[in-house]
């Protein structure tokens, strides 16, 4: 009897082990078939030629605080500006920097966080504090020329012209100020969207008309002198039924050429309008919150999946699409010497052929995730998500 029980126990243990082994194999098989994250950043090849040389770098030591979990909070300011050989950016204070050497030429004390970044031109630099007050300072002396309370946040840089300063608030109010004395020339309030979770665009001036895109997904054309509205049109139509699908924020500044103006929005379209009456000439699918670029008779944009697309500016047809950088959180696009340049979340800077989208070069910067880039002559200025700046020579 005892031997029989031992036999039963041995059979049970063997069977149990086999069952556990099968379960393990099944789990392993299941794990083997788990799909990769479809939104994981695309891996890139780094064996292309280098085309940049670092000139100088300035770290933003006041760009973050430590949260309770010990994580870095990104800098609020992600916009710098340039005027001549000077660079304007916000670190502990607003600094005026020599682009060639990186030397700080002047500091302007700032007592509050700046959400709008800084804009510069026509002898002044402009920024808006987090409490909604706009400051206009003299470029040479740094002294304040005038200020005005907007009572609302501004998330995008101001537009400076020879006579006016234009700012758009987060609640879709466009203000036009007199450059010299700060007098309000006119203002326009758009019908706000029921749902808006993104930023705001900057207004654009072309042939005496101010083109402004709003969170409700509409583009308006107003006369700069008196604010009279010539037309207002939707950039795209609502395609879904959920609130998120109805989100149509337009954070991209409009762009104009000859008798046409182009605008794009999130979850929407790239649309070409007639400047004079707002008639829609074409509309093609595009979801973006990044600036549009025009090159010859084409338009360039990156969509929300970080694909780079070139469109025919006449009929909207797609000329080429590069999907090699999907989900790499690429920066705005800039053009230099017939090539397209942009940065990504790992601090890489990429160069594409504008004719066909072919990858031509790659360079590694000393910064973190690159959010903003600009070209001045043969220099590339880049800024990362912590507000640090690096200037590189293009060769």
PLM feature spans:
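Extracytoplasmic beta-rich repeat domains
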Residues: 20-28, 48-81, 105-121, 144-161, ...
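Bacterial Sec signal peptide processing site at the extreme N-terminus
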Residues: 15-43
